[in-house]
């Protein structure tokens, strides 16, 4: 059940992926969909198969009026904390749009500081098509980065757990220690470094 969006305003949707993982960037995306060129099958990226996400990823990039990916690094996450780093990454995604939106819908319960009107929408990735599109761009982008990290460090299993603190990942982290891409402010990483 999607929320009706005012079609007289240029609207962007923004979502993030990767607040919970112990490693890598928090990745956000901003998308302005084209009402004249709808995309069928948009939904929260977590509810879609990987195959469907990849197909929609290409379709979104092709059909959207504008799209942008923003991120915050592990160093920024450690310096700012994960919430503030996520807000920064969202600001970067909106700033990267080739067209400035008049209204921005953000998934969740708080908005970053933006130069245009912004509204937080709880469960927005299931309610606002542009947020669904943003969630797909962010998730496919971040998953690809974890697959690439896995190719450099296969012993850590990043392609399987995507950096999330699964039992397998925590055991590997305790045994091998963190790589530079880890978020050193996160408790399991601090524990592995012997500073918790």
Curated annotation (Swiss-Prot):
Compartment list: Cytoplasm
Segments passing through the bilayer: none
Q: Where is the RNase H type-2 domain?
A: 9-196
The residues listed in the UniProt record as binding a divalent metal cation, with positions renumbered to this chain, are 15-16, 107
The keyword Magnesium is annotated on this UniProt entry: no
Arranged from A to Z, the UniProt key words for this protein are: Cytoplasm, Endonuclease, Hydrolase, Manganese, Metal-binding, Nuclease
Binding note for cofactor: Manganese or magnesium. Binds 1 divalent metal ion per monomer in the absence of substrate. May bind a second metal ion after substrate binding.
Catalytic activity reported: Endonucleolytic cleavage to 5'-phosphomonoester
Cysteine pairs forming cystine bridges in this chain are: none
Checking Pfam families in the record gives: RNase_HII
Any Gene Ontology CC annotation: cytoplasm
E.C. designation(s): 3.1.26.4
Q: Which domain of life is it from?
A: Bacteria
The Swiss-Prot or TrEMBL record lists the needed cofactor(s) as: Mn(2+); Mg(2+)
Q: List the CDD domains.
A: RNase_HII_bacteria_HII_like
A single BP term in Gene Ontology: DNA replication, removal of RNA primer
Specify whether Nuclease is a keyword of the entry. yes
Q: GO terms for molecular function, please?
A: manganese ion binding; RNA binding; RNA-DNA hybrid ribonuclease activity
Q: HAMAP family annotated for this entry?
A: RNase_HII_B
Q: Which family does it belong to?
A: Belongs to the RNase HII family.
General function of this protein: Endonuclease that specifically degrades the RNA of RNA-DNA hybrids.
Q: What is this protein called?
A: Ribonuclease HII
Species the sequence originates in: Aeromonas hydrophila subsp. hydrophila (strain ATCC 7966 / DSM 30187 / BCRC 13018 / CCUG 14551 / JCM 1027 / KCTC 2358 / NCIMB 9240 / NCTC 8049)
């Amino acid at each position: 059940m999607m929320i009706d969006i005012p079609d007289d305003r240029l609207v962007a949707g923004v979502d993030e992926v990767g607040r919970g993982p112990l490693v890598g960037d928090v990745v956000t995306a901003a998308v302005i969909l084209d009402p004249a060129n709808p995309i069928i099958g948009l939904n929260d990226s977590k509810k879609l198969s990987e195959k469907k996400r990849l197909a929609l990823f290409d379709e979104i990039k092709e059909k959207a009026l504008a799209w942008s990916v923003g991120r915050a690094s592990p160093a920024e996450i450690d310096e700012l904390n994960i919430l503030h780093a996520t807000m920064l990454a969202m600001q970067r995604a909106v700033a990267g749009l080739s067209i400035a939106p008049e209204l921005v819908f953000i998934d969740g319960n708080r908005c970053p500081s933006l130069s245009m009107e912004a509204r937080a929408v709880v469960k927005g990735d299931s309610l606002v098509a542009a947020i669904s599109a943003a969630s797909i761009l962010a998730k496919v982008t971040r998953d690809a980065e974890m697959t690439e990290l896995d190719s450099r460090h296969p012993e850590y299993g990043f392609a399987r757990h995507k950096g999330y603190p699964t039992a397998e990942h925590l055991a590997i982290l305790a045994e091998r220690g963190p790589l530079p891409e880890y978020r050193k402010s996160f408790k399991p990483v601090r524990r592995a470094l012997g500073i918790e």
